[in-house]
Amino acid sequence: MWTGLGPAVTLALVLVVAWATELKPTAPPIFTGRPFVVAWDVPTQDCGPRHKMPLDPKDMKAFDVQASPNEGFVNQNITIFYRDRLGMYPHFNSVGRSVHGGVPQNGSLWVHLEMLKGHVEHYIRTQEPAGLAVIDWEDWRPVWVRNWQDKDVYRRLSRHLVAIRHPDWPPERVAKEAQYEFEFAARQFMLETLRFVKAFRPRHLWGFYLFPDCYNHDYVQNWETYTGRCPDVEVSRNDQLAWLWAESTALFPSVYLEETLASSTHGRNFVSFRVQEALRVADVHHANHALPVYVFTRPTYSRGLTGLSEMDLISTIGESAALGAAGVILWGDAGFTTSNETCRRLKDYLTRSLVPYVVNVSWAAQYCSWAQCHGHGRCVRRDPNAHTFLHLSASSFRLVPSHAPDEPRLRPEGELSWADRNHLQMHFRCQCYLGWGGEQCQWDRRRAAGGASGAWAGSHLTGLLAVAVLAFT
């Protein structure tokens, strides 16, 4: 009898371990319901009427969301609140003049909160539909030590304000008090802002642009030894912001590539570790779920209009998809649409390179979700540092023109082969959406919620043990 139960117990233990190592569930996708969203947030609406070079509308349908960061656009699926669009954000302007108190402890949180309703209502005018809301406050950072270089003005003024009140204090005491006052006020400004806007527009996912960051820009000084890894001290500092992650409902890191990193493994490592850090933060600071991560990138290299190479499309969009991000937001400013020539270059790049890659990755992520996760989760690379991507297999699929007017210019034709499914099984696992569980997101936790969640989990494990016993006795 006991020898017969040996393999059953072994199998049951394997199943229990697999259950225990399940990824935390995350928010289901918004917009189109796809597991990986690609959004276009570039003010290209000017290319047609102003420069007589409109982008191909069928190319633009490849994106799940289209928006513009320009001032005149409201009620969009993606809304970016720059510093002058949300309340009274204390900061110093480009000429060094104090605005709204300069430093957070010198600003009026009460007046700031009083103004939020009108500003949010102006840009997001209705509760529905759900969308992304990104607060872009970049002038100071809530962790004192991170206010280096041109941001040191916030530390200097903070020390000055304390020294005025306590002229007899030694510099060390002044600095310590200044840090406390700055960090406390910064925290209050960010926390209370999030709490207010979440209550006012609860269907939107809210977070701060560039949070978290991992400060892995040392490729300029250390090209030969650069790994892309986030310094341990910066990972620790991100954990000091647990209060921010707990209040956020989405994370919005940035992976803009400098041309220095073009078509290099350094570029891929730079992106990969930034996204991995965002996913780590998204996972560890919530007990029962992981926050969705939407990665900001650009269709071009930073500070220019040169389109990303194929390798760098893979290193940015492809890497984000394979690691398990909820999506990418392709952002650009008015520099993309200053003339007929800039619009033409962008239009050609979209048709030639960007749109075919976006269609490929979007559909590959969708097929993986269907095949691996029953459509109730997204595929996540088992080994974050592996060189495996969510790409349609060239032996099973091809992109063909779509002639339907309401569809993107390209669509995939083909189906997953046995080899494709085996590859996905080997290299990717599922992160289920909230309400679903199991290795392949096959268990409807909402249906099982008639009993306590603990009782449901227990009955599930009991079932696994029973199956194992039946199989080996």
UniProtKB/Swiss-Prot annotation:
Residues 452-473 form a propeptide. One of its GO terms (molecular function) is virus receptor activity. Keywords: Cell membrane, Disulfide bond, EGF-like domain, Glycoprotein, Glycosidase, GPI-anchor, Hydrolase, Lipoprotein, Membrane, Receptor, Signal. Transmembrane segments: none annotated. Residues 1-20 form the signal peptide. InterPro entries: Aldolase_TIM (IPR013785), Glycoside_hydrolase_SF (IPR017853), Hyaluronidase (IPR018155). Disulfide bonds join 47-343, 214-230, 368-379, 373-430, 432-441. GO terms for cellular component: apical plasma membrane; cytoplasmic vesicle; cytosol; endocytic vesicle; lysosome; membrane raft; microvillus; perinuclear region of cytoplasm. Glycans are attached at residues 77, 106, 340, 360. It catalyses: Random hydrolysis of (1->4)-linkages between N-acetyl-beta-D-glucosamine and D-glucuronate residues in hyaluronate. This is Hyaluronidase-2. It comes from Bos taurus (Bovine).
